[in-house]
Structures are given as structure tokens and as C-alpha cells.
Amino acid sequence: MATEGTTGSGSRVVAGMVCSLWLLVLGSSVLALEEVLLDTTGETSEIGWLTYPPGGWDEVSVLDDQRRLTRTFEACHVAGLPPGSGQDNWLQTHFVERRGAQRAHIRLHFSVRACSSLGVSGGTCRETFTLYYRQADEPDGPDSIAAWHLKRWTKVDTIAADESFPASSSSSSWAVGPHRTGQRVGLQLNVKERSFGPLTQRGFYVAFQDTGACLALVAVKLFSYTCPSVLRAFASFPETQASGAGGASLVAAVGTCVAHAEPEEDGVGGQAGGSPPRLHCNGEGRWMVAVGGCRCQPGHQPARGDKLCQACPEGSYKALAGNVPCSPCPARSHSPDPAAPVCPCLQGFYRASSDPPEAPCTGPPSAPRELWFEVQGSALMLHWRLPQELGGRGDLLFNVVCKECGGHGEPSSGGMCRRCRDEVHFDPRQRGLTESRVLVGGLRAHVPYILEVQAVNGVSELSPDPPQAAAINVSTSHEVPSAVPVMHQVSRAANSITVSWPQPEQTNGNILDYQLRYYDQAEDESHSFTMTSETNTATVTRLSPGHIYGFQVRARTAAGHGPYGGKVYFQTLPQGELSSQLPEKLSLVIGSILGALAFLLLAAITVLAVIFQRKRRGTGYTEQLQQYSSPGLGVKYYIDPSTYDDPCQAIRELAREVDPTYIKIEEVIGAGSFGEVRRGRLQPRGRREQAVAIQALWAGGAESLKMTFLGRAALLGQFQHPNILRLEGVVTKSRPVMVLTELMELGPLDSFLRQREGQFSSLQLVAMQRGVAAAMQYLSSFAFVHRALSARSVLVNSHLVCKVARLGHSPQGSSSLLRWAAPEVITHGKYTTSSDVWSFGILMWEVMSYGERPYWDMNEQEVLNAIEQEFRLPPPPGCPPGLHLLMLDTWQKDRARRPHFDQLVAAFDKMIRKPDTLQAEGGSGDRPSQALLNPVALDFPCLDSPQAWLSAIGLECYQDNFSKFGLSTFSDVAQLSLEDLPGLGITLAGHQKKLLHNIQLLQQHLRQPGSVEV
């Protein structure tokens, strides 16, 4: 009998075909391995399995279906048995070691005779047999062998043949298969496969039960499935036994990353430290359900698909773990060795800590160029140009080093100098400057300094060399004059502009002359021109017609030039227009003649207008004039858009149509009654880009709204003045309909002033009012009445130039404009230039009060009563008397006694030239004495502390200042003077004036009998 070791060898074969064990089948499976536990296929020697009862199964040698001799177990005891005789023949294998298998598979080769061919009737013949198994930790001993068939067996299945074969008629003994004369032929076989488990003990037995069949068991093969070892996703997975549960059950196998690989992060991306990869082996020995994987470490790239990670070659790198190829080294870097995670920079070049590895190496910048400065009293504005070489970076910054020197020396003679005192300060800061200028303050007069400007960037600290720098020797004097506060236009022509300005507020000596700098706004400011004037007036000639020019002026004393004042912009007249100032020497006779001719011509045109009025319905705008006169005689006119049936026709004649492709629309900056207002850019072909404000008409608006919208644009397009909002163009041929005007960055004048309370001198506020008055003088020359003049209808640009807007606004039904309305407007609805003068006076009060609401919180009826009783607004805190007197002139009840706008402009010019006139308190003998309104009086009995008093007057921001300096009673506050306020931290001029005004009221209250001190 052959031993079990010879029949159940541990050899392994690939199921189905001969192929590589490492073949990875994409899509989740690999061919399974069969771990053979027992195999009788082709066995020729005695097998020796146990049978019961003896003779129930016979072990014989027969030819198989390949005509090979093989050992076979046969059972066929149905012939000759009486009906009803039962069969119970058992065949048991030897003890089979499971060898780690969790489930066993059995493959049976057998043949069954057909009962019909045996001539057996009744139920004694079967064509099936039953398969069993039982587990054991040890082989059966001698005592157990005798009763093996009585042990507890587990049924696997009843095995039925797919085909049964007839009995051979020529064979005297039992035979299976067709008969050939003179020899035994090969068997015809069925093949069945079953599995059982899970297996938990050392081994098992398999048994076959025959209950009345005629069959031959030709071959038995017991095996288990194993998933082979594989390389997948840069990880190796070991050989793994299939699950004992079979079917879809899975066994997880943990993989090991190949050399120079690491587990992938559990999340998306990230560094090393993820869970090891896993594959799952199913019950048929096939890999599936991959979880995770490995990735090549920094400095390594994939090779042979996803099997290996190899080092990056010289001159390349890979900074992060991942399965991407290496990259060539960035500019100015090189990796001399393989497996580089980053390419080191070449000598003289660096990477900042914030630079990624893929960034090119960069260097420090070169030194700044062309340092120069402008002295501003004890301070100076230091300028420089950008370095020639930026080092390949965009994070350029500047540091300023200040050295105070004991004597005059070159910048290189640092041994004589020391670090500047702490009193020297820098605005906006000393280090990390982003712009090429800095204001240096706190310098001592007549002390030589060296200012050094260093250029640095993100890699300057990595360089062993100090930052490249440029230095300049500077010295300041307190005696230079201060800045000229304001400048205004006296007259203009097509090729010239005459400007005038007041003396600096601090002359610090005798003014020797003034230096005027000017440039064309259409060109770069660096192309500016200068001229010198010994007076405070200058005429600039050789200018281009219709161009806008920027002007600045500074004064010079023996100590040197003071700083330039702010930029102011004026425009020359278009070619062919008359000068804005008539020659002073014009003959009275010529003037009389021209006046007579103008009167006659006006009368003639008026008669013609009446005659043809009925015939002009729908005619061109050029025939419908608000005032009829000849422009050749210097009398101006404008066209009233409301007389047009089609506002688009007026737009075509009076405004420039803009191609929408030239417009770039940006963010929303506001909204009006017609639609949103957006910031934008306009760049017609061949012209410089300019910032504009774009108002688009609401979609779906009424036709009347569109007519009003376009009518206002047509009106605005007729006026060209530096202090009137400029129309840049319109879009009417596409949707939405848009109106483009110049951009006024600082918005309405009232809100602008409220946000900057106390930040301007009286002269600067006068200059703002002068600009508005000049615009109204220009409009009144056209007999145009604004009707809605107020601080909110005036816009301010970034150069503090005030421009009148909202032309054509209809105030009818708008009670909100009552506070600016003249008495005749309130009572009779009569709008004239004189009513605009009244409104301008209210605007003056708004300016001097920094945007305070006229008449404060009085309701409309109270305002009407006050005006009717001839009460007038009092001077705002800090308002010069001369300005308030001018306001009172504009508020004369008799409109004929109010000044004209040209008189107001002349008054402002006089104040600017001679600032002492602002303080003049004398009045005209013709001016009636007018009662002045007071703001809402403070309820002193309800104010229990200086802190409550500060809140009542709107200066609660200084409550901590009062507490810090022990101002706890009204008596303490009443003793404060102007000199005390800076020491309390109250430096804004407007706040100082407001506080002093209310201190005076407080003093009056404390002097009253019965007042209680708190």
C-alpha cells in the first residue's frame, strides 16, 4: 500500500495553464495557486484506503480515458440482489494534513453505469454517491480504525453523474466504457468539484458512501486555493491562503513598500505616514479590492510601471513623494548627485524659506539709483529710483539707514557718523518700504545727515554680503518756507493760463521768488517744466489748446526752497474760443457798440423764435436755444434738452458716442436714481486709458426715465469747465444705456468733509468754495440755473478739486432740498441765479462746518419759520468772520441785494491773496443786522460730568483724555485754553475749534445765577 506522503505531495501548479506566478491581471485579479493536499491521479501502486464493509469497494487497476493504467476504486453490487436490498458501502481516505488551508477543494473523476443497462428493477439501483468529511487533530489510532465509519461525518454533497454509461455485454467482470473485442477499453469519465470548510484542526478525512450504484472512482484530488505573491502599486504582497468561508469572503494581506517607496497618505496628498497598502484574497485564490498603495520617496521616480522606484538622475530632482517623474533643475540650480529631493542653488543665488523647490534661484537686488530729496521744514521727502537689477524676484523692499554726522563728510566716511537719534522718525516706516520714497521727520536744523537706502528682497538675508545701498548727504533748515496752501486760475486762453497763489502760511523769512512746476496731464509727470516768478502770479504760455495741465508751486527764501504744494489742474480753452478774461483795456465805446448789437440781435432772434415756434416741433437741438444770442459777441448759450421729443437726437449732437468695447467695467461704487454707478476704465483706440465713472440705466425702466437720464447727459456735455463734472461719453446704441463721466475718487463733498473733520486749514476750505463759485459763475454766464446746489451735489477728486454735478436735477416735490432753498423758491417756486447764490451760501456753511446738516435737527416747519422770521445760520466753530459775513450777504432776503457769482469769486481770490481779510469783522453799511440761529442748546442740568458733556457735543472720543488728566468737573473744563488742548492729545484743528466754542457756552452757563457746579 502506498503511503499518504507519496500520494499527497506538496507540489504546486497553476490552475488551468502554465503561466508566470507574478502575472498581475489589471482589474483586480491574479491567477490562483492550487496547494495540493492529496492526489491519486495517475497512481499505479496500491492506494490502500479503508473500506466498509470489506469488499464493498474494490481497488483495481484499469485504463483511464487517456488509456493509461491507473488505480481505481469500484463498487457495483446491484446485480442479482433481491428488490429492496439496501447497500451501505464506505470508502475513507488516509489522514490528510491541511497545511494551513482554511478550505479544501476536491476534484473527482468517476464513471457510473446506467441502471437501465443493468437490468435491475425497483429502487435498489442508484446513479449517485455521497461525499463526507471529518476533521481531526491526529490520525486515527488502531482502536479507532475499526469503527471509523461510525464517527460523526459532515456531508459535503450528493454527487450525481452528468452522464451514465451502458454496461459492456462482452465483459464477464464489471467494466465501464465501450467494449472492444479482445481488450478492455478506457473509461468514460465525469468530473465534479466541491469544497468544504472552514478547516480548523490539523487535518481531515474524506469518505465516499455508495448506497446502490455501479460506479468507478478513478481519481481524487484534494487541494486548497492560494493567492500568489505579487508586486502592485510599488508594494509587494505575500502569498496568502484563501478564505475558509469560500465564495465572496475575503482575506486581507498587508503589503510592504518596495525600496525607496513609502505608504500613501490616508487623506488627499500629504507626507509619509499613511497606512500600509492592502490587497484582499477571495475564496477562489484571486486578488481583489486594493486599498491604498505606495509612492516613490522624494528624489525617486517610478520605473517598470509601478514595480520599482529609481533615483532621479544628475541634473534633476523630485521634492515631494509621489508617482510622478523627476523634473529638470530650475534656473540657476543644479543637482550633482542622484536622488536629489531639491536642486542646490549655484553660487551667489538663493531660495527664500517661502520659495517652493520648483522656484528658480534668485539673487539680491542691486543698489537703488538717483537719490534726491525735497526739504519740508524740519523734515524732508527722500526719493530714489528702482534698482537696475531686481535679482529675478518681485518682493523688492527698501530699508533706510540714518546717520548723524559731526561734520561734513562723504557718505563713505562712516567713522565720523553715528546712528540718528530716536527723535528722527520715518513715514510710513523705516524698514520694509514698498514705495520709492519716505518722509524723514524730526531732523535737527543745520545738522549734516547721511541717508542710506538699502534694496533688499526675500533672499538678501541669505547672502553673506551686506545689502546693496546708495547714500546721500542731506541737511535741513527750519527757515525754509512752508508749502503754498492753494492755487487758483486767474484767466485762461487757448495757449496760456494765468495762475495765482497766496503766500505760505509760514514764510520763515522774506520770500525771494516762487518756482512753478507744470506738466500736461496727458503725458508723464516726469516731463514737467519749471518757471520762476518773483510775484505770486504767473502766466504760463506755449500750451496746447483744450489740454489739462497740472500745476505746483513752492516758495524760496535765503534758506532754500520749501516743499511743493498740492497739485492743481486747469484746462486751456479749445482752439477758437475767447479768453475767459476780457482784456482790461477794452474800449468803452467798443463795448457799448457790441452791447447794442447784441441787444438788437437778441430781439431779432426772439421774434423769429416766436414766429417759427409752431414749426419747430421735432426739429434739431441746434435750433432750440435757451438764450438767443451770437457767440461771436461773447454771449454764451446752452440748449435745453427738455425741448427735444427724442433725447437720443440731443445726445448725438451734444455728446460723444463711445464704443462699448473700449470700456472695462469694474466694481460698484454707488447707486443713483437711474441705476448702479461703477468704476471703470475707458481707452479709445490710440488714446491713453483713463478712469471713469459709469452709470448704467436700470433695465426695464420707463421711457420717461430714459429720456431724463439721457437729457441730463446731453446737458452735462455742453459745459466744459475745470470745476464742472466732465462728460466722457455715452453708450446708446447697445444695452444697457450708459453715461460715462470722469471719476471723482473722493465722492460727494459733504461726506468727504465729515470723514476728515479738522484736517484742513481755512485757506484750503476757501479754495474748495472758490472752485464751486467759479463753476457757478461759468454756469450763470449761460443763464443756467442749477436749482439743487448743495455740498452733496459737488464731487471731489483725488487732487481735492471740487466739481459741480447733478446738472438738470429737478427739485420739484423734493422737500429734502428745502434747507438750501431761497425764500422766493419756498413761497413762489421761482428759481434764478440769485436763488443759486442763496444755496451756495448754505454750501459755504456746510464746508466750514465739515459737512454739518444745515439747521441741524430742526424739522421742515421750524426751518420755514426761521427763514421767514429772517433768522440766519451762525458761523460754524472756527469759521473766520470774513467768511461768515460773505454767507450773510448770500442770504439777503431781497434777491437783488445778493452778490453775483463773479463777485463771490473775486472775494475768494482776495482772501487767498490776503489771508488777513478772512478775519475782517466789519460789515457793509447796506447789510441789515440779522438774528442768528443757535444749534440745539445743551441741557446742562442733565449733564452730570465732563464725559457726558463731551458726548453731548459729539467729542466723546476724548473722554479718556479728560479722565487721564483729571478733568473731572465743569470748572476744570471751563479753564481750558487753546494752548492746553495739544497737551491733552487734541490736535485736530476742527476738534479744537468745536471744543473751544462749546467751552465758551459752558463758561456762559457757569456765570448764570443759580447754575450748579458738577
UniProtKB/Swiss-Prot annotation:
Gene Ontology annotations for the cellular component aspect, listed alphabetically:
cell surface; extracellular region; plasma membrane
> Which parts of the sequence lie on the Cytoplasmic side of the lipid bilayer?
613-1014
The family classification in the record reads: Belongs to the protein kinase superfamily. Tyr protein kinase family. Ephrin receptor subfamily.
Question: Which parts of the chain does the record assign to the membrane side Extracellular?
Answer: 33-591
Which Pfam families is this protein grouped with? EphA2_TM, Ephrin_lbd, Ephrin_rec_like, fn3, PK_Tyr_Ser-Thr, SAM_2
What post-translational modification does the entry describe?
A: Ligand-binding increases phosphorylation on tyrosine residues. Phosphorylation on tyrosine residues is mediated by transphosphorylation by the catalytically active EPHB1 in a ligand-independent manner. Tyrosine phosphorylation of the receptor may act as a switch on the functional transition from cell adhesion/attraction to de-adhesion/repulsion.
In Swiss-Prot or TrEMBL terms, this protein is called Ephrin type-B receptor 6
Which ranges does the record mark as transmembrane? 592-612
Q: Where is the SAM domain?
A: 941-1005
State the organism of origin.
Mus musculus
Residue numbers covered by motif PDZ-binding:
1012-1014
Which PROSITE patterns does this UniProt record tie to the protein?
A: EPH_LBD, FN3, PROTEIN_KINASE_DOM, RECEPTOR_TYR_KIN_V_1, RECEPTOR_TYR_KIN_V_2, SAM_DOMAIN
Q: Which gene encodes it?
A: Ephb6
SUPFAM superfamilies in the cross-refs: Fibronectin type III, Galactose-binding domain-like, Protein kinase-like (PK-like), SAM/Pointed domain
Carbohydrate attachment sites?
A: N473
The free-text domain note is: The protein kinase domain is predicted to be catalytically inactive. Its extracellular domain is capable of promoting cell adhesion and migration in response to low concentrations of ephrin-B2, but its cytoplasmic domain is essential for cell repulsion and inhibition of migration induced by high concentrations of ephrin-B2.
